[in-house]
């Protein structure tokens, strides 16, 4: 049995269906007013594929794994920070059970092959947040090219997703959504593939634009700021001068973990050396 066999195990999938769809989803949906759009764009989609989304709340991963049709994403595995979610047994069990989570190293450690690449090669779809950490303001940082590199290297599609209103409902620093069931809208985009000769950086930028294009019309309808109209994400107590020019968000390592971070994925898969994460 391989180290990744549990991610596609029917037994684990059955347990996850109960905990995720029959327990987690009702609790989450009762805390916010959730609407899901664009699932018809996933018709005919088959693993493996990568899901990418903007990231400003711990609601993001929950919304995506609970909203994606089970037939399409029942085995969807969520990347999670190894230095937070996999250091204590209760977090490891929790994230594995609810999110089919796999570890992403944010320390710069490289193994011969990333878990993400291995999962995709075994037809397990994955969820990544290419910004690498949650935004403090809802602004979107530059997408790191790791998810795009995985797509190019393995010749698989990427599904862009916009999570709209999650920052307003449960911003970074809150452990539960605000009272009153604030609205959150999740929009699935059509699967995308790299153009012939397109680099991971260029494809990643195109994926980020696709997320913006999904996000902004919905934000207008909800009466909240568009994704690029928000102030840059700055950790409380830090000056904006510490930001990388043009980054649009804080690129420092998250201090309390994020499910779905792809901060380290863009290493060797992006450079085609085959020695990733």
Residue ranges and their predicted role:
Residues 24-55:
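Helix-to-loop junction immediately C-terminal to a conserved catalytic motif
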């Amino acid at each position: 049995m391989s180290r990744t066999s549990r991610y596609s195990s029917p037994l684990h999938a059955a347990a996850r269906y109960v905990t995720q769809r029959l327990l987690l989803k009702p609790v989450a949906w009762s805390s916010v007013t959730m609407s899901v759009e664009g699932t018809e764009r996933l018709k005919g989609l088959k693993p493996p594929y990568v899901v990418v989304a903007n990231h400003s709340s711990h609601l993001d991963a929950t919304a995506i794994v609970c909203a994606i049709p089970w037939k399409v994403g029942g085995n969807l595995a969520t990347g999670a920070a190894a230095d937070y979610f996999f250091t204590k047994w209760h977090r490891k069990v929790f994230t594995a059970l609810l999110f089919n989570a796999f570890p992403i190293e944010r320390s710069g450690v490289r193994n011969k092959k990333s878990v993400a690449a291995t999962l995709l090669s075994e037809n397990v779809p994955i969820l990544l947040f290419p910004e690498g950490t949650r935004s403090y303001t809802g602004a979107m940082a530059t997408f790191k090219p790791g998810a795009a590199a995985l797509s190019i290297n393995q010749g698989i599609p990427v599904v862009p997703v916009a999570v709209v209103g999650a920052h307003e409902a449960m911003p970074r620093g809150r452990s539960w959504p605000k009272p009153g069931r604030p609205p959150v809208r999740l929009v699935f985009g059509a699967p995308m593939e790299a153009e012939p000769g397109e680099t991971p950086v260029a494809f990643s930028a195109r994926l980020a634009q696709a997320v913006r294009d999904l996000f902004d019309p919905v934000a207008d309808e909800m009466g909240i700021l568009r994704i690029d109209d928000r102030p840059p994400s700055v950790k409380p107590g830090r000056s904006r001068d510490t930001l990388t020019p043009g980054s649009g968000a804080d690129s420092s390592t998250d201090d309390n973990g994020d499910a779905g971070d792809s901060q380290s994925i863009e290493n060797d898969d992006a450079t085609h050396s085959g020695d990733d994460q």
